[in-house]
Amino acid sequence: MINGVLQIDKPKAESSASYIRRLSKLEPELKIGHCGTLDPMATGILVVCLNQMTRFASYLSSSEKTYQACIYFGKKTSTGDSEGEIIDSKEFSFLDFSSKDVENTIQKFLGKSKQKPPA
């Protein structure tokens, strides 16, 4: 019996669930739990617990996480993310902003927040 924690580097355009299904097909008797879902458009580490280690999945899920993002200024999309159609764009120059302006804006995105999906 295999017990352990896998760290899978999930590529863009593939769902977390597809990896779980693939593991289940490889070993049907394997008990599998994952520690959070990544959006299909996201890349990153998908943490998967196997057999006896599944009891630690909730502990690992509640651990602190870090995210890295790429921000595109001056573009508005139909979905509010990089996957949508660009519905508005404006010329943008960092010369229009001081480093303090950028720092103050970044601070607004730190900590817990609730996201409002586009209407």
Annotate each language-model stretch with its function:
Residues 1-119:
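Catalytic/RNA-binding core of pseudouridine synthases
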